[in-house]
Amino acid sequence: MRYPMSKLAYHRVLLKLSGEALMGSADYGIDPKVINRLAGEVIEAQNAGAELALVIGGGNIFRGAGLAAKGMDRVTGDQMGMLATIINALAMQDALEKLGTKVRVMSAIKINNVCEDFIRRRAIRHLEKSRITIFAAGTGNPFFTTDSGAALRAIEIGADLLLKATKVDGIYNKDPQKHCDAVKYSTLSYDEVISQNLEVMDTAAFALARDSNLPLRIFDIEQPGVLLRILHGEEIGTLVKERNSKS
């Protein structure tokens, strides 16, 4: 389907990718074919006129919480996880730049020889100048997930929508991989997610989105062209929003 260039439903969005999304069928690391495909999806959306920010997890390289459960100091583990997100951000920057676009990586922890510090006004300026901006190192603090970092950055840059890319095509009332009668929701309110105890994001991230009335869409990143379709207003996946919101 072709869309008019000016008919975007969302102008500025933040896309949250898990680190695992970069692995493909591998058990660890980054699959070049996968990251190049994802970069192509992002470029396609940018070419339609969207301002795009990204947050990428680090679970394909390191999970601090998992090793903390086995005895590693949690703060140290989380700091190592932050470094993993920087590795992924640099890999995505490289993939995007090879496709001819301008990209900036901004880190919540100081690593000046590698990427910029996160400064809100500078980040917004990058977006206004059509530079894809990748936010790395989460919030810069231990005990907070990259979901929390994504929600925080989306609010700070004034995003119209927070997109969480997963391997499932939305939110269900129960695990669709275990229950053939699982029901998918097209739209939910924040209160419905809480009352039904649905797993959308971690509690801190979800609270940030809810309190700032930030619309959140959960969708399957494996579908070709899905990002562009969402930006043009197609109802894909599950939208979580304030009950009376028009987003």
UniProtKB/Swiss-Prot annotation:
The keyword Cytoplasm applies. Keywords: ATP-binding, Cytoplasm, Kinase, Nucleotide-binding, Pyrimidine biosynthesis, Transferase. One of its GO terms (biological process) is 'de novo' CTP biosynthetic process. Its EC number is 2.7.4.22. It catalyses: UMP + ATP = UDP + ADP. One of its GO terms (molecular function) is ATP binding. Pathway: Pyrimidine metabolism; CTP biosynthesis via de novo pathway; UDP from UMP (UMPK route): step 1/1. ATP binds at residues 16-19, 59, 63, 166, 172, 175. It comes from the Bacteria. One of its GO terms (cellular component) is cytosol. Transmembrane segments: none annotated. The keyword Transferase applies. Gene3D superfamilies: Acetylglutamate kinase-like. InterPro entries: AceGlu_kinase-like_sf, Asp/Glu/Uridylate_kinase, Uridylate_kinase, Uridylate_kinase_bac. UMP binds at residues 58, 78, 139-146. It is found in: Cytoplasm. Pfam families: AA_kinase. Catalyzes the reversible phosphorylation of UMP to UDP. Belongs to the UMP kinase family. Homohexamer. This is Uridylate kinase.
